[in-house]
Regions:
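Short amphipathic alpha-helix segments
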Residues: 170, 243-251, 272-292
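Short secondary-structure junctions
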Residues: 111-115, 257-260, 288-297
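Hydrophobic beta-strand segment of the Class I
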Residues: 1
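C-terminal accessory/connector segments of nucleic-acid motor ATPases
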Residues: 54-171, 175-182, 187-188, 264-273, ...
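Terminal, basic amphipathic appendages of nucleotide-handling enzymes
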Residues: 52, 64, 133, 145, ...
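Flexible glycine-/small-residue-rich
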Residues: 32-35, 45, 152, 180, ...
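A generic structural motif
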Residues: 120, 193-198, 293-314
Length: 369
C-alpha cells in the first residue's frame, strides 16, 4: 500500500493496511510518501500513535435528534399512521429515541405530522420538505461527516469543518487559513456545503499550517510527541530522518516537555496547545465572549488577541459548554428542518465538543515566550 501524505486517523490507516498481504507468501506493507514538512510530521505522528497500540474507539454521534425526527416520519410513512400514545413500542428503548417526545411535539406543531384523534400520519409540511421522488430522502439515514468544500472560482482548495467558519471569518474580518494560505470568504452555500473564497494576498503564505478538519486530541498530541523527540517504530529513509530533524529544529520553540507554549508577537498571542480543533473550540466556548469572539483555532493552535492572559485558562469550567457553530451551519445537518432551530444547533454542537481534551489543556502549565 502506497500512502501519499497521511490519513487523519489510526483506524483509517489500519483499514488501508488490512487490504495488503492477503496473498499466500505476502506480508502486510505500507509506504508513506510525504510531500512537505507538515505532512511528514503528520505521518510520523500517526505512526507513532499506531506504535503505542492506540486505535480510535467507535463512538456513535451523541444526541441524534435529527435521526429521531426521521424515524418518526418514516414510521408514519411505513404504517400509514401510528398511535401517539404508544410510539415508544416501535424502538424498544433505543437510545436514538431518547428525548424524542420533544421532537414529536415539534413535528405535530409544524404539521410534519398531522393528527386525527389519537393517530398521527404524514402531514403537509413533510410532503413539501421530503415528498420528492416518493420520499426517497426520508428513507435513507446514511449521513456523512459535515464538511464544507472550499473553492476559488472553479478550483477546489480543500475541505473544512463548520468549526472553522467563525463569525469573524464569515464576515471577512479574519481570513480562513487553508492549504498554507489565507483566504477571504466571499459566499457560503450551506445547502450545497460550498464556501467560495479569494486569496488574501496581503497575508502571504501561512508559515505553520494545520489540517482544517478536526483531528483527535490523541492524534495531534502524537505530533507534539514527535516534535519532542519520539520516533515512529518504522523504518525511515535517510531523507525522512534528515527532514524530521530539520522540522524539530524549526519548531522547537512551539513545544516544551511539561506544558504549553504561548508565543506573543506584535499583533497576537498564539497558544501552541496541540489539543485538536474540537478541544480548542470547546475551550473557547468556556471563555468570556470578549475573549472568544476575537480568537480563532485549528488543530494545533489557538490564536488570541495580543493581551490575552493565560491565567484565564486555570480552573476554567467546561460543564455544559458547546463549541460555537455558525447558525447557518444547521442547514447542512440532514433532517434539521424537522427540528426546532435551537435543538438542531445543539445537536450539531454536541458533535464537535471535546471536554476531556479541553480539560487537559486547562490543567497544563503555560510558558510565555
Amino acid at each position: 500500500m502506497i500512502q501519499l501524505d497521511s490519513p487523519r486517523s489510526v483506524s483509517s490507516f489500519l483499514q488501508r493496511l488490512g487490504r495488503t498481504g492477503r496473498r499466500a507468501g505476502s506480508v502486510r506493507n505500507a509506504l508513506f510518501l510525504a510531500t512537505d514538512n507538515d505532512t511528514l510530521l503528520r505521518a510520523a505522528g500517526l505512526l507513532h500513535l499506531w506504535g503505542t497500540g492506540f486505535v480510535e474507539p467507535v463512538v456513535p454521534p451523541p444526541s441524534p435528534r435529527h435521526i429521531a425526527a426521521q424515524q418518526l416520519l418514516a414510521l408514519a410513512l411505513q404504517e400509514g399512521r401510528f398511535a401517539r400514545a404508544s410510539w415508544h413500542e416501535w424502538w424498544a428503548g433505543s437510545h436514538v429515541m431518547d428525548g424524542a417526545d420533544e421532537v414529536l411535539d415539534y413535528l405535530v406543531e409544524q404539521e410534519f405530522l398531522a393528527a386525527d384523534g389519537p393517530w398521527l400520519f404524514i402531514g403537509p409540511r413533510a410532503e413539501k420538505e421530503f415528498g420528492r421522488r416518493h420520499f426517497l430522502e426520508l428513507l435513507s439515514t446514511f449521513i456523512a461527516d459535515l464538511e464544507m468544500k472550499v473553492i476559488e472560482g472553479r478550483r477546489e482548495i480543500g475541505s473544512i469543518a463548520p468549526l472553522s467558519l467563525t463569525a469573524q471569518v464569515i464576515e471577512s474580518r479574519k481570513p480562513l487559513l487553508l492549504a498554507g494560505r489565507a483566504w477571504t470568504v466571499e459566499s457560503i452555500d450551506w445547502d450545497r456545503r460550498v464556501v467560495a473564497v479569494r486569496e488574501d494576498l496581503t497575508k502571504g503564505r501561512v508559515r505553520w499550517g494545520s489540517e482544517p478538519m478536526p483531528e483527535s486530541f490523541e492524534m495531534v498530541r502524537a505530533r507534539r510527541d514527535v516534535l519532542l523527540g519520539a520516533d515512529p517504530p518504522v523504518r525511515l529513509s535517510q531523507r525522512a530522518v534528515a527532514r524530521l530533524a530539520e522540522v524539530r529544529t524549526l519548531r522547537r520553540d512551539q513545544v516544551v516537555e511539561d506544558g504549553l507554549v504561548m508565543d506573543r508577537s506584535e499583533k497576537l498571542s498564539v497558544l501552541w496547545a496541540f489539543g485538536g480543533l474540537k478541544a480548542h473550540a470547546t475551550l473557547l466556548a468556556a471563555l468570556p465572549d470578549e475573549v472568544s469572539e476575537s480568537a480563532t483555532a485549528d488543530n494545533e493552535t489557538i490564536r488570541f488577541d495580543l493581551h490575552f492572559e493565560a491565567d484565564l485558562l486555570d480552573g476554567l469550567s467546561l460543564e455544559g459548554v458547546l463549541p460555537a457553530i455558525a447558525p447557518q451551519a444547521v442547514d447542512g445537518l440532514k433532517f434539521s428542518v424537522a427540528l426546532p432551530r435551537g435543538v438542531a444547533a445543539a445537536t450539531l454542537g454536541e458533535r464537535f465538543v471535546d471536554r476531556l481534551g479541553a480539560g487537559r489543556l486547562t490543567r497544563a502549565q503555560v510558558q510565555v515566550e
